[in-house]
């Protein structure tokens, strides 16, 4: 069991930051200013787009930011017309954050640009490495979905 724990810590502390930085963060930094938003706001739009409607608490957890920071960020995204707040019909004390057409257009445009950039990087891998890479991603996703669904 120590081996799996050590390997997990090693992956989280060494490998995951490389993956995140080289395959996602650098493009968030590059493209966010194009849309007059910061990289955290662009990440939020991507998360909201993938969830359609999301609570503030869930979005805080996914972005790993404080609720006060999220409130200011959502206020800004709302004023720019990228998201709206809607009462949660299952709990009227809460609000859901919903992406607008303009916000969805930004998220989709970023995703299209990200796909092009990632294709440039990942096509450098030979065919065997591409297969191993896809297999590793699928395996990791399957295991995480099996044991850690929320």
Regions found by a protein language model. Name each.
Residues 1-6, 128-150:
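C-terminal regulatory/oligomerization modules of transcriptional regulators
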Residues 16-27, 63, 106, 110-125, ...:
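Alpha-helical linker/hinge and terminal dimerization helices associated
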